[in-house]
Regions:
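Flexible coil/turn and secondary-structure edge motifs
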Residues: 28-209
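Enrichment for repetitive, rod-forming helical segments
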Residues: 9, 21-23, 202
Length: 209
């Protein structure tokens, strides 16, 4: 080597490799936090919210379940007592290239009435409360911002809880894809179908976000 040239050593090469790896890991961690690939919300009976989000482009899968409570692996019967702390919620898996977490949350305000505490129509109890469960600070910020903007469209205060997710518990199999499997069920005809029609009308009138 000529005087002044740097001779790479094993230690320096290893150090640079570690720095590069750290940057790569940080980049992907930040990217995952910004975009996400699922949202968990509750707005009354999960059959209704599930059916609504199944109509949205970019949504890959919607799973009904329970979250926000203090009982592990709750059953539907337990949640219905209102004593588990859980709400009926849906896990919404989406394609971030087609729809963002914020857009998923913006649609939430059209999917239910967020101004009625512990109630959606005739469904009454804490398990039917309006709730958004976030998994990181980026989701929390997006949810709070969306809620703040949505308030301008409601006369009464929005009572939606925005809380960190602990665990999402999928509901029993017979609850999954309920409306599509049971379109003639009395609840489907009396509650879910009108809510779907109202949602689709509201989205059309609002236009693309």
């Amino acid at each position: 080597l000529k005087i002044g040239e740097f001779a790479p050593t094993f230690t320096s090469v290893k150090l640079r490799a570690c720095i590069f790896l750290s940057l790569v890991v940080t980049f992907f961690a930040m990217n995952a936090e910004e975009t996400g690939s699922r949202a968990i919300v509750g707005g009354g009976c999960f059959w209704c919210v599930e059916a609504v989000y199944q109509t949205v482009p970019g949504i890959l899968r919607v799973t009904s379940g329970y979250a926000g409570g203090n009982v592990a692996n709750p059953t539907y019967e337990q949640v219905c007592t209102g004593r588990t702390g859980h709400a009926e919620v849906v896990q919404i898996e989406f394609d971030p290239a087609k729809i963002s977490y914020r857009q998923v949350i913006d649609l939430f305000w059209q999917a239910h009435d967020p101004t009625t505490p512990n109630r959606q129509g005739a469904d009454v109890g804490p398990q039917y409360r309006s709730i958004i469960l976030y998994e990181n600070e980026a989701e929390k910020t997006a949810a709070e911002s969306s809620k703040l903007e949505a308030q301008a469209h409601f006369k009464d205060p929005i009572v939606t809880e925005i809380v960190p997710l602990k665990t999402f518990y999928p509901a029993e199999k017979y609850h999954q894809d309920f409306y599509n499997k049971n379109p003639s069920y009395p609840y489907s005809e009396a509650v879910i179908r009108p809510k779907l029609e109202k949602f689709e009308k509201a989205v059309r009138e609002k236009g693309p976000s």
